[in-house]
A protein has these predicted regions:
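Conserved N-terminal entry element of GNAT/NAT acetyltransferase domains
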Residues: 2-40
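Short, flexible loop/turn elements at secondary-structure junctions
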Residues: 38-41, 87-89, 98-103, 140-142, ...
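Short, well-structured beta-strand/strand-turn elements
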Residues: 60, 67, 267-277
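A short helix-loop-beta-strand connector motif used in the catalytic cores of GNAT acetyltransferases and
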Residues: 74-84, 107, 269-270, 280-286
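C-terminal/domain-terminus segments
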Residues: 270-308
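Short, cationic low-complexity segments
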Residues: 307-331
Length: 331
């Protein structure tokens, strides 16, 4: 039985907690503001995040079923930080992520990280030694319901773009970060055959051959792999993508926006397989890893370089974004 979602938090309370010292940057589009907050310094903002997350995830077919989507990872001394986009004209949250730096990951008695994804994925020794110290885990990405329909809200089209601005700034602020680790989510309401085509396509073009991270209970496709192989016959990513887009549209669906966004971010993205998140509406979570210095140039310029132009003092000599900057200077 789903609980009734809490009422909106008073906007004056939210504004009182969104102080200048917590502001990360302005967005490239729409003149929105990006903040980093925690449960300790912004308890009312966190409640509003939990409310908006639960609304957005329920609408898509997931969610916790609780009055707000907050868990143990949102609280405590080693909690995830919350990155949010704030619309200063409407005084409301547009969307957000939560994140935790690899250097702050705690390990359990088996040597596995205590993360929001730990119940679904096993991390190899190689990942823990060679990747974890330079990785930031991203999770619970959401766009508030009011900003998901571009037909009714002209700023909706920039909601995801605004979130990427925040992630771009993180690579500059945290010099050790070289990788984004996170999940792509597919919901049970999405047609099975379309889901299978998307996951097959992703595995074909982005599969991790090193088994750096593996799902504990890998999701099995309903569609025979031979049928899918007969559909995706191209070696080229773009050619196969055109096939995917066409076939999914035939089913009356679109490729989910976040899946599209991740695929278009880096040609060397690593895919770690898919597991079912039984505590979150049985959504299907696909683990991914993106190397920051291999993000496509258009995305780098928009989301990383734009922050450095505004805040050159933030770029540290060891920053994971340095490879991006100096690579472009050499061209």
């Amino acid at each position: 039985m789903e609980e009734e979602i809490i009422q909106p938090i008073d906007r004056e309370l939210l504004k009182s907690e969104l102080t200048p010292d917590k502001q990360l940057r302005m967005t490239n589009k729409s003149h929105n503001e990006i903040y980093i907050v925690t449960a300790k310094d912004s308890p009312n903002v966190l409640k509003e995040i939990g409310r908006l997350r639960e609304i957005a995830f329920r609408e898509a077919g997931g969610g916790t079923g609780k009055s707000m989507d907050l868990d143990e990872f949102d609280f405590g001394d080693n909690c995830y930080k919350q990155l949010i986009v704030w619309n200063p004209e409407a005084d409301e949250i547009i969307g957000g992520y939560r994140y935790l730096l690899g250097k702050d990951w705690l390990l359990d008695e088996k040597g596995q990280p205590k993360l929001a994804t730990s119940h679904m994925f096993h991390f190899s020794d190689k990942f823990l030694k060679e990747y974890m110290p330079y990785t930031v885990e991203l999770g619970r990405s959401f766009v508030s319901l009011e900003y998901q329909n571009v037909r009714t809200n002209t700023k909706s089209i920039f909601a995801l773009d605004n979130l990427w601005d925040g992630l771009g700034a993180l690579t500059v602020l945290y010099p050790e970060v070289k990788y984004f680790f996170g999940k792509m989510t597919m919901y049970p309401s999405y047609i099975r055959r379309g889901r299978d085509m998307i996951l097959y396509f992703l595995k074909k073009h982005f599969d991790d051959k090193e088994n750096l991270v593996i799902p504990m209970k890998p999701l099995k496709l309903d569609t025979p792999e031979s049928d899918l192989a007969a559909i995706f016959t191209e070696d080229d990513f773009k050619a196969d993508y055109r096939i995917l887009n066409r076939e999914v549209r035939k089913l009356g669906y679109n490729i989910p926006p976040l899946v599209n966004a991740y695929m278009s971010l880096s040609p060397t993205m690593k895919l770690f397989g898919t597991a079912i998140n039984y505590g979150f509406g049985d959504v299907e979570e696909t683990g991914i890893l993106i190397a920051i210095d291999e993000i496509l140039e258009e995305k780098r310029v928009r989301h990383i370089n734009s922050f450095i132009d505004e805040h050159p003092e933030a770029l540290k000599i060891t920053s994971g974004a340095n490879n991006v900057i100096y690579k472009e200077k050499d061209i």
